[in-house]
Amino acid sequence: MSRRHKAEKREINPDPKFGDLVITKFMNAIMFDGKKSVAERIVYGALDVVESKVKSDPVALFHRALENVAPHIEVRSRRVGGATYQVPIDVRPDRRQALAIRWLISAARGRNEATMIDRLSGELMDAANNRGSAVKKREDVHRMAEANRAFSHYRW
């Protein structure tokens, strides 16, 4: 279905504690049922745990973790003459960030620590050190793109 107009980007405010737009996006992605205060408590709690364990700037570690998880290339399905090919394409910067946030959160939710604060802080520290489920997901996506490099001429 086509749209008449491109959807406008909504303006979001930076988070109150660190003044960072990406942390606000991360909170919004963690949030369930519009409960922003719960999401804030989880994210700020996780960043406090990271700060106490690593003894360095938690925001810098958060950004490093996001950068380590963000994919540079992915595969998209494309039908050509009755066959469906997995065509590798570059990932746009806004989508890179969105995928990194989504993968970090799903990896944290998949861990088996007691609280979400512990899970998220553990996953952030792992991702910052190029370990963990979220980084594995990125490597799988890159491996898939590498395996299908033969179809890269089907880009659109």
From Swiss-Prot:
The residue stretches assigned to a coiled coil in this entry are: none
Report if keyword Ribonucleoprotein is assigned. yes
According to its record, what are the GO cellular component terms? small ribosomal subunit
**Which taxonomic lineage does the organism of this UniProt entry have?**
Bacteria, Pseudomonadati, Pseudomonadota, Alphaproteobacteria, Hyphomicrobiales
Briefly state the protein's biological role: One of the primary rRNA binding proteins, it binds directly to 16S rRNA where it nucleates assembly of the head domain of the 30S subunit. Is located at the subunit interface close to the decoding center, probably blocks exit of the E-site tRNA.
Q: What is this protein called?
A: Small ribosomal subunit protein uS7
Which cysteines bridge via disulfide bonds?
Answer: none
Q: Which SUPFAM superfamilies match?
A: Ribosomal protein S7
Query: Is Transmembrane helix given among the entry's keywords?
Result: no
Q: Which PROSITE patterns match?
A: RIBOSOMAL_S7
Q: Tell me the GO BP annotations in alphabetical order.
A: translation
**What organism is the protein native to?**
Bartonella henselae (strain ATCC 49882 / DSM 28221 / CCUG 30454 / Houston 1)
